[in-house]
Amino acid sequence: MIEKIVIANRGEIAVRIIRSCREMGIRSVALFSEADRMSKHVMLADEAYPIGPAPSKESYLDVDKIIETALKCGADAVHPGYGFLSENAGFARKCEVAGITFIGPRAETIERMGDKISALRSMTEAGVPVVPGIQRQLESATEAERICREIGLPVILKAASGGGGKGMRLIRSESEIGEAYAAAKSEALSSFGDETVYIEKYIEEPHHIEFQILGDAHGNIVHLYDRECSVQRRHQKIVEESPSPFLTDELRQEMGKTAAAAARAVGYVGAGTIEFLVDKNRNFYFLEMNTRLQVEHPVTEEVLGLDLVKEQIYIASGRPLHLRQTDIVQRGHSIECRICAEDADNGFMPSPGLVKQVTEPNGLGI
């Protein structure tokens, strides 16, 4: 069993991981940049070590420094949290080489599912429905025009290494193709260091529904049901809820089985999320897989009564899943909202400040 975990992150997710470590009797190690010396996660952890200056590239993204610190303090595992290095295959691989357990999937799985074109190919081979389009690099605007005529407008261009809505362009008329293609490639390169883009049919009025999954090193896979995240702005999630009010019981079961099959097809180990688009006729299509714990994971925890961080740690320790699919039942309803610190009277410009008062809802069952 893992005995000491370095948390390669900061803020809310670091505090969240420390809580589970404490309940499991596992020592937690916080890392902090110069700017985070007095942060809450530093105060709560059993041990804390500096890893560099305030800029993330020189601290929380410094792979060698993190591994060096983990070895120095005698940790046997690293939890990447979300963001930063959580989906960095190189980091996972270096942890393995150093003899440190990476609490997450294997490096090759991160690579395979992190590239959206590779992920689509894997899902097609596994018989998982995908959105019509091409499963390779789009070579030119001229090729985009030809594909648009084949599958019909509207279409969407996406960055193969993308996420967070970056490197995406919606095309509703052929006159937009040239400009959209150039813009998508440019944004993909600046955001992800990879200008590869692909094209697929744009699903009108979709519901964005994701399924949480867990897989162990013994080949066992379960799904932990659904979260709906259709309320978005700039392709970024604003509201998450579980269960989805859009799904029927039959469709929920079918999508859950498909999500588990998708994870099984790539030999997934750890906690992950299979994301789907569901059209207005309730046809569903694979969108992408997140090979990490997500910000919104507590939505699932609330309706299932599970601690996903603990499950991650048990899996990373080599234990088989203690959950059977028939044991997992949703109870109640859970909603998580993102608060955007923006000025609505000034073009929604960023407007950070101090939250002076919070009134939490209360009542029976809340």
Task: State where each predicted segment sits.
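Alpha-helix initiation/capping motif
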Residues: 59, 84, 112, 137, ...
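Acidic/histidine-enriched active-site and ligand-binding environments that engage anionic O-linkages
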Residues: 146-156
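Conserved beta3 strand of the protein kinase N-lobe
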Residues: 133-134
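Short beta->alpha connector loops of Rossmann-like oxidoreductase domains
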Residues: 130
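N-terminal nucleotide-binding beta1-loop-alpha1 segment
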Residues: 159
